[in-house]
């Protein structure tokens, strides 16, 4: 439960139809299993206490009379168990029979939720035996049950006293399939998780639709959704059920027991902090008052994580998705640049080409933009500006890349200019400090700006999102331009986009792109080593970009605090980095992220391509003089 992770489960109850005592033992077995697994919240199938397929036996006093004693047995047995459990059962109230979910925890019957939408078409005829909760007119009732006074109604919001974000509501099977499901009101009223007790039969194509429906509902409502369907041990007289379990969070299926698979429990963790952050930032997510809170006490525990946490959250896990993502990003970037060039009536674009990844991607975008505009690639002006740290490999790759793409390329060696500048300001060339480095970066920007003035062009900056987050750019140097095509593409994704382009390129261009991909990331502002190789490697100085991109994604997208970032990174990387290494770079990230906001407050225009970006005019509006002491203190305390 700490850090917002609620361990949820959908449980199998292999019923014997109408054998309430046998089914009770099965329910208790699942509850004990969930307790041993550290589950917070357990969902069992619809009408699992009796079996869903009892048919007209639901008119029998003998069957219905066995329900309350069995429920009392379950409530009593729950006294020593940790999970909150939702059990499906038939229940009489006010002279009518309702298809219900009873929510049980630690010897308490917290509440009973009746089903609202009863299917009465095709193979289903629930209205023959049951009444809809619509007859209750949305009112909340209290009923005597198992020696307790129990809330009864569809507007119950179950709230954990020890964690504000840990709230859930309940709907049953068909409730999910209608245009306005109860879950809409429940989530608008504050429920972070929806439990669905279901008995959905298996027919061709239905599992795919069900999976899509659960995922889409969790996305639309920004909620966690636990779906638990009935077992094949239900009557097969006219239907077959499949034991289909689904656990989804905000559009992503976290865990699934596929139809007819044999899992007794399907378990994952729903991050309620993440969900509430999503609702907080989405101001169109309206709230609805009028739900009845039902408070329960569940001690906070450290949840053992089992869900997948992607170590590279910006990068899709599958090749097909990655190719689609890369193509979509390139289209957004190139369309954005095309519009800017046309609007300004620019005759050319000018960019510094270094033989590194970022300038390579920027050039590829420029080529696409000029293709879209029907203009010659020769109107793209690339400039290589060698100085003290430039290596033969990067310079050669820069020139080859330009030649392969058919763009204009020229060299302006800035060594003499920088040395003159050192002399002008009285800086010793042997002192390789920040002045030594930044003089080169600013000289390069000046050259590009002046060439753009000469040719009525736009300077295209090559820096990307990860560098902006860390402030790894020279203020008014490579930080500045007239348009920033890479500004919302993180470093980990830049690599894959270039790789994607290499895969569809002619052999000679592919060879250059692959060598660029194989080159260490470096600004090349310090002299090369004795072998002429890159001596200044960015990731040795600021840390692994995959770690920083991980921190950046979860900080900006979900508001995660340092403690949670550290915990998730340890889990996601599975021992690739030691705890000490992760913590070291987390501290660096927190410090630099706050210190370097002043650079982000005045960055050039550029296209947003993903949900995480740092534009001061769009997604990230942070004061340049905000203090990061809270974040740093928490990181230091880990």
What are these regions (language model features)?
Residues 1-352, 368-377, 409:
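Enzyme catalytic cores with a strong preference for nitrogen-chemistry domains
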Residues 6, 23, 164-166, 223, ...:
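ATP/NTP-dependent adenylation/nucleotidyl-transfer catalytic domains that generate, transfer
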